[in-house]
Amino acid sequence: VIGDEDTVTGFLLGGIGELNKNRKPNFLVVEKETSVTEIEETFRSFLNRDDIGIILINQFIAEMIRHVIDTHTISIPAVLEIPSKEHPYDATKDSILRRAKGMFTMEDLR
């Protein structure tokens, strides 16, 4: 999970937070002072971890590193953009969703 404090705390309370064998957490709380570089590095490190199958990221944070997210083309780990308390979800900004929609025709969805 990469998100604001409320989002990450909610998922941690739900039991998804853990440390891997190298004592690295599977979450990042993004605060005002968190640099874009740190977010990018964390996202890239999550992509390379074999213990992570899904990366949940607040959409407003995904917008900060959109250029990195758009380069991710493999299905695992899946990247899901989620809303935060302060920022509602906007499907038009979700590049992963746009790519997925392009894979199917209307007949496939019937």
UniProtKB/Swiss-Prot annotation:
Subunit structure: V-ATPase is a heteromultimeric enzyme made up of two complexes: the ATP-hydrolytic V1 complex and the proton translocation V0 complex. The V1 complex consists of three catalytic AB heterodimers that form a heterohexamer, three peripheral stalks each consisting of EG heterodimers, one central rotor including subunits D and F, and the regulatory subunits C and H. The proton translocation complex V0 consists of the proton transport subunit a, a ring of proteolipid subunits c9c'', rotary subunit d, subunits e and f, and two accessory subunits.
Annotated protein name in UniProt: V-type proton ATPase subunit F
Cleavable signal peptide: none
InterPro entries attached to this UniProt entry: ATPase_V1-cplx_f_g_su, ATPase_V1-cplx_fsu_euk, ATPase_V1_fsu_sf
An MF annotation (GO) of this entry: proton-transporting ATPase activity, rotational mechanism
Family: Belongs to the V-ATPase F subunit family.
A family per Pfam: ATP-synt_F
Keyword Zinc-finger in record: no
Residue spans crossing the bilayer: none
This protein's GO CC annotations: membrane; proton-transporting V-type ATPase, V1 domain
Known role: Subunit of the V1 complex of vacuolar(H+)-ATPase (V-ATPase), a multisubunit enzyme composed of a peripheral complex (V1) that hydrolyzes ATP and a membrane integral complex (V0) that translocates protons. V-ATPase is responsible for acidifying and maintaining the pH of intracellular compartments and in some cell types, is targeted to the plasma membrane, where it is responsible for acidifying the extracellular environment.
Keyword vocabulary terms for this entry: Hydrogen ion transport, Ion transport, Transport
Domain of life, source organism: Eukaryota
Coiled-coil regions listed: none
Keyword flag Ion transport: yes
Gene3D superfamilies for the chain: ATPase, V1 complex, subunit F
